[in-house]
C-alpha cells in the first residue's frame, strides 16, 4: 500500500469538468456477515478504476452512500483508498469520502486519506442530531481550516443527512476556498444556487445534466454518474454530446441520451419515491450494478443488507436497461 504520494496544487472549481463517476466499494462474498473482516475486494476495486480511466471518465468519487462509507471499518477505508490512489497514479482527480458522526473524526479521516493521496473528500454533514444552518456552515469551515490542502465536494443529500441544504447555505459555502464542487440533487433551484455560489462547480445527476446545461451552459460543465457503474459508455456519450451541443446549438442527440437514461432509471425507485429508495439505497444500487454485469459490486455490509424482494426486481431491471445502453453507446 502507498503511505504517501506527491501532492499537487489543491483542485479548484475550474478543474471539475466532464463525467464524474461514483464508485461502489466492491465486497467479498462474506461481506454481509457481521463477523467478517477485510471485506473489500481490492482486486476488483483496481480493475474498476483502470476500466473507468480507460473509458475516459474525468474524475472519480467514492465512499458515499452506496460506497458504504457508513459500514466500512477504518482499516477497510484506508486499504480501499490506497488501492484507488495507487491505481489512478494521478491520471484523474479523486475524491474519497469521509463523512462521519462528528467533526473530530471527519478531520482525522480526511487528514489521513489526503495524506495517502486523495485529492479531496465528498463530505456530508454529521446526522445523528439534525443540524441547523449555522452548525452545518461551521462544520465545513472547521474541516476546511483543519485540512486546508483538501478540496471539498459538498455531499448534498437531504435524505441521508437530515439537512435541506437551503439557499443561504450555498452562499456561505462559496466563501470557503476549499469547497470547489457539490454532488447536487434536483435542479429546481439550480439557477438561484448558481448565483448564490459563484465559486462552486455544481454536479447535477446524470439524468438532469442535459436540462441543467441548458439552464446555464457556462457554469454547468460536469455531472455525477452512478449509472456509469453499469457501464460508462452512456455517461461518456452524454458528456461529449452536451459539449458538442453547446458549440452547435443542436441539442437533439444530447436530449435523446438523457431520455434513455431516465427510462433506464424508471424502475430503480420503488413506486417512483426517492424517500423510499433512500431506505434501501445501498442494496438497490448494488443489485442494479451486479445485474448490469460491468462490475462485481458484491453483497451489502450489515445492517443495510436487507431489501424487499420486489424492490430488488426493479433495480435489476434498471441494471439490465443500463447494460443495454452501454452496449448501444459503445458502438
Swiss-Prot record:
Entry function: Involved in the naphthalene upper catabolic pathway. Catalyzes the transformation of trans-O-hydroxybenzylidenepyruvate (THBPA) to salicylaldehyde and pyruvate. The reaction is reversible. Can also use substrate which carry trans-alpha,beta-unsaturated keto acid side chain and adjacent hydroxyl group such as trans-4-(3-hydroxy-2-thianaphthenyl)-2-oxo-but-3-enoate, trans-4-(3-hydroxy-2-benzofuranyl)-2-oxobut-3-enoate, and trans-4-(3-hydroxy-2-thienyl)-2-oxobut-3-enoate.
Organism of origin: Pseudomonas putida (Arthrobacter siderocapsulatus)
Assigned EC number: 4.1.2.45
The protein's name in its UniProt record: Trans-O-hydroxybenzylidenepyruvate hydratase-aldolase
GO biological process, one term: naphthalene catabolic process
PANTHER family: 4-HYDROXY-2-OXOGLUTARATE ALDOLASE, MITOCHONDRIAL, DIHYDRODIPICOLINATE SYNTHASE
Family of the protein in this entry: Belongs to the DapA family.
GO molecular-function term, one example from the UniProt record: aldehyde-lyase activity
Gene3D superfamilies (alphabetical): Aldolase class I (3.20.20.70)
UniProtKB keywords: Aromatic hydrocarbons catabolism, Lyase, Plasmid, Pyruvate
UniProt keyword Transmembrane helix present: no
InterPro entries associated with the record: Aldolase_TIM (IPR013785), DapA-like (IPR002220), HBPHA/CBPHA (IPR048038)
